[in-house]
Amino acid sequence: TICLLLFPLTVVPLDGDQPAHQPAVRKHNIKSAVQLRQWDEEQQCCTGQCHICWPCC
């Protein structure tokens, strides 16, 4: 408990690769796929070139 008083958790830098950051990347990929007309809104997956977006149908 003394460690928490000396070193609060707010001073510890968080890792940038947290799962909370991944949806933003995924949304960017979906947006690109929608522009290329490869995103299936009904099935919520990518049809066509799967290296452009994920998940792939």
UniProtKB/Swiss-Prot annotation:
Expressed by the venom duct. It holds the Pfam family Conotoxin. It is found in: Secreted. Disulfide bonds join 45-57, 46-53, 50-56. Residues 17-44 form a propeptide. Residues 1-16 form the signal peptide. The keyword Ribonucleoprotein does not apply. InterPro entries: Conotoxin. Keywords: Disulfide bond, Secreted, Signal, Toxin. One of its GO terms (cellular component) is extracellular region. Belongs to the conotoxin M superfamily. The cysteine framework is III (CC-C-C-CC). This is Conotoxin reg3.17.
